[in-house]
């Protein structure tokens, strides 16, 4: 999972222009980096130009996803990531960046601003912080912990059973379980196996 670009743009009546951007092109060849960076800036502008105000969307191009959020006040943000990166985290990042940008940079500067004139330097830190979505996003962290717990529980159950033993055999031999509990287990097992086939 990787983020390559984070940009803030202004969608004017006739033209979209870049206000500020940050790039991580370290995974590309040294000689390709400037061309890739230019292409990402061009793609970001094109996507914002073709998006409606007040919209969020994702555009797939080969193994990359471009996530765009255009606010009603014409301020827009674009994140370019690989297709494994969670879209929800991208839109959370865009919302956070655009909100912070709109409070730190005067609205009057947006239509005429450029990367050289806009005083906002947080994009690089956001781009590096959000490289790992689990660290940056609390929901992703909770989901990862739940997945780990599920794996641990599954492994623990398998390790409790002795070699060659099956849970089905243990249930049928059990003296503690009543016949109704055994019947419930068998019915549940059949229903679950039915669902696995589909």
Swiss-Prot record:
CDD domains for this protein: Longin, R-SNARE_YKT6
Molecular function GO labels: SNAP receptor activity; transferase activity
Database matches in Pfam families: Longin, Synaptobrevin
Keywords: Coiled coil, Cytoplasm, Cytoplasmic vesicle, ER-Golgi transport, Golgi apparatus, Lipoprotein, Membrane, Methylation, Palmitate, Prenylation, Protein transport, Transferase, Transport
Start and end residues of each v-SNARE coiled-coil homology domain: 138-198
Covalently attached lipid (S-farnesyl cysteine), positions: 195
Cysteine methyl ester modification, residue list: 195
InterPro entries: Longin-like_dom_sf (IPR011012), Longin_dom (IPR010908), R-SNARE_YKT6 (IPR045848), V_SNARE_CC (IPR042855)
Presence of keyword Membrane: yes
PROSITE patterns: LONGIN, V_SNARE
Function comment: Vesicular soluble NSF attachment protein receptor (v-SNARE) mediating vesicle docking and fusion to a specific acceptor cellular compartment. Functions in endoplasmic reticulum to Golgi transport; as part of a SNARE complex composed of GOSR1, GOSR2 and STX5. Functions in early/recycling endosome to TGN transport; as part of a SNARE complex composed of BET1L, GOSR1 and STX5. Has a S-palmitoyl transferase activity.
Entry comment, domain topic: The longin domain regulates palmitoylation and membrane targeting.
Family: Belongs to the synaptobrevin family.
Protein name: Synaptobrevin homolog YKT6-A
Taxonomic classification: Eukaryota, Metazoa, Chordata, Craniata, Vertebrata
């Amino acid at each position: 999972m990787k983020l390559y670009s984070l940009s803030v743009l202004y969608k004017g009546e006739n033209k979209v222009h870049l206000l500020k951007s940050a790039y991580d092109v370290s995974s590309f060849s040294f000689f390709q980096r400037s061309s890739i960076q230019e292409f990402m800036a061009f793609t970001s502008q094109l996507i914002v130009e073709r998006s409606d105000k007040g919209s969020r969307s994702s555009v797939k191009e080969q193994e990359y996803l471009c996530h765009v959020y255009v606010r009603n006040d014409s301020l827009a943000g674009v994140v370019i990531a690989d297709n494994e990166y969670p879209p929800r985290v991208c839109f959370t990042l865009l919302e956070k960046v655009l909100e912070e940008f709109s409070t730190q940079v005067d609205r009057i500067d947006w239509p005429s601003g450029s990367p050289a004139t806009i005083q906002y330097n947080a994009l690089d830190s956001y781009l590096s912080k959000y490289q790992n979505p689990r660290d940056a996003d609390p929901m992703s962290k909770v989901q990862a912990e739940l997945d780990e717990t599920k794996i641990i529980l599954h492994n623990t159950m398998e390790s409790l059973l002795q070699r060659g033993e099956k849970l089905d055999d243990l249930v049928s031999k059990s003296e503690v379980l009543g016949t109704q509990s055994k019947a419930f287990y068998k019915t549940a097992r059949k229903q679950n196996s039915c669902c696995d086939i589909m």
